[in-house]
Amino acid sequence: MSVALQELGGGGNMVEYKRATLRDEDAPETPVEGGASPDAVEAGFRKRTSRLLGLHTQLELVLAGVSLLLAALLLGCLVALGVQYHRDPSHSTCLTEACIRVAGKILESLDRGVSPCEDFYQFSCGGWIRRNPLPDGRSRWNTFNSLWDQNQAILKHLLENTTFNSSSEAERKTQRFYLSCLQVERIEELGAQPLRDLIDKIGGWNVTGPWDQDNFMEVLKAVAGTYRATPFFTVYVSADSKSSNSNIIQVDQSGLFLPSRDYYLNRTANEKVLTAYLDYMEELGMLLGGQPTSTREQMRQVLELEIQLANITVPQDQRRDEEKIYHKMSIAELQALAPSMDWLEFLSFLLSPLELGDSEPVVVYGTDYLQQVSELINRTEPSVLNNYLIWNLVQKTTSSLDHRFESAQEKLLETLYGTKKSCTPRWQTCISNTDDALGFALGSLFVKATFDRQSKEIAEGMISEIRAAFEEALGHLVWMDEKTRQAAKEKADAIYDMIGFPDFILEPKELDDVYDGYEVSEDSFFQNMLNLYNFSAKVMADQLRKPPSRDQWSMTPQTVNAYYLPTKNEIVFPAGILQAPFYTCNHPKALNFGGIGVVMGHELTHAFDDQGREYDKEGNLRPWWQNESLAAFRNHTACIEEQYSQYQVNGEKLNGRQTLGENIADNGGLKAAYNAYKAWLRKHGEEQQLPAVGLTNHQLFFVGFAQVWCSVRTPESSHEGLVTDPHSPARFRVLGTLSNSRDFLRHFGCPVGSPMNSGQLCEVW
């Protein structure tokens, strides 16, 4: 399990946390009725000037004289201010180019028409929201998206360089993969044939033609093993939560195509989505050779099977206590639990050439689910099982086929997210695909082209300061007993941080070894993807008999994100996020602590959220809290859960339980970063203020934090986030966190009873 800062997009093994152009930023605001735009003022001035030069009336000459006098007085004031500034050794205002630029960006993002004590998110982001309408093809737009677009543009330039010549075979594979994705003419020429051939190789599909009726296990092994789809369940190799120095086979629930079980079960509210999904299933089936009438009926049966899976799928908010859902057993015991398939045969194929026996240990997350899946398989018609298994393969591979498949998907995405994927340039899609396939080789190119090594040293220093601030606050918690407090301090001390990138990516031999065995051709994008699935299966098998590597990264260097991994007790900050607006070396420290500092505090606090707190300093899942402190912790977190459950988006309430861990991390991260900033000021003295913004540096810290989360989103995407995302929506990551901050309320003078100060603060760390 990994915890990431912000969801950036769908899919993938990581919880993804998951951005505006210069043109959008420079676009003038639409003037309100009765107001004047900058253009209107400029036009009026020009008209008056032409009349002045043409008529020279006495009144106009007098006015001109007065204007010149006022201009002279203003110039005199500016000169006086300049003299005073140079005589002032403290130089309390920062007038460097960097300070002036960032002050301008902050000012254009603000909405001065809103009181910070009424709605701090609107105060901080109202201007940004006006200037940043959703770009075509996007269901949401924010700082993370903007920065990822910048990173993608850099990678595009590097990969399309005609003089590309690398000593690393892995880097050459990266360019070949990217170019194969760009070969649209070749992809169109092949059409659906590559997938048709693959389906025939596996044994056929009842939707499109003859199929082998007695090959359930063979099809399951091919679909879930060779091609890494996840029908019914997902199998992976990862660190054992209760013995984190060893890897183990793990099995968990899976098998739904739509983002959440809610889309299947709340059929009235999601009728449009379910209809669009069935239309999509039918269209893909026909593109692969199915007949209209029979295809729709067979795909309707697959959809009904997915609805039954949704019924037994455990909601994410009920899976937050890993102690309760962790079940270690042998393959023999797994066989007894879910006897509808041969688990030893399946896992032996999946992890070939390793030899497995009935006594091989497995961790199962959700025994009730697997038991019910087994019963569901037993009572389902073989033809429906075949259709469902091949459908899982189809949906995994169609993004590598011609435009007809993309057009079919676009209709579903528009219903699901309110956006059209076709608006996304092909090169951006190909950069994302390359990042998924050869992310660390791509990261090598990115780091060598962009990363300032000094950033790594500065980031390490900031982490130390934030860790110290967190531990100091730990010492003042009245609800925690001394034994638990000491253990918590030891865990905080033991948190391992990784910054920028893993060292191996800059060593060509080591980088090549990582991708050794992955064959990449410039001629066949579809085959490159199949080779990737097969290669990833082999990599997974290779990990089982090896101990987890402390220095193994779960995120590529160019990613705009960060994460905490409880089984390693480590926090990771890729190079992709160590940039403006999160961090810039020549910006005020208030902004850096409010940006990347809060990110660091957020990830550190994950070690002590409702899930991370179950792991000890060695990364093992075990009880290490005293009962009194645990009860007090739960009381404090209940306040957070209740608070966030009251927030609404488009009339739909947040799930305070589902978002609890991230909300704890947001609140704790802000507090740790602000305390670290105060400690920095005590050591270095007050820093210069930005010109024109009218904010103290303490206020600037909170504005900088809030503006990281400026965001726009379609209603459909907002709904999807509410039912799937462990993070609260951006607006409430700001409002919820700051309304619990005594420091924020003090520096902005928000009285009790104002919208930002209810008088009841929820505080855990």
Swiss-Prot record:
Stretches assigned to the Cytoplasmic side: 1-60
Keyword terms, alphabetized: Cytoplasmic vesicle, Disulfide bond, Glycoprotein, Golgi apparatus, Hydrolase, Membrane, Metal-binding, Metalloprotease, Protease, Signal-anchor, Transmembrane, Transmembrane helix, Zinc
Cofactor comment text: Binds 1 zinc ion per subunit.
Catalyses which reaction(s): Hydrolysis of the 21-Trp-|-Val-22 bond in big endothelin to form endothelin 1
Annotated ranges, domain Peptidase M13: 93-765
Similarity comment text for this entry: Belongs to the peptidase M13 family.
Protein name per the record: Endothelin-converting enzyme 2
Listed Pfam families: Peptidase_M13, Peptidase_M13_N
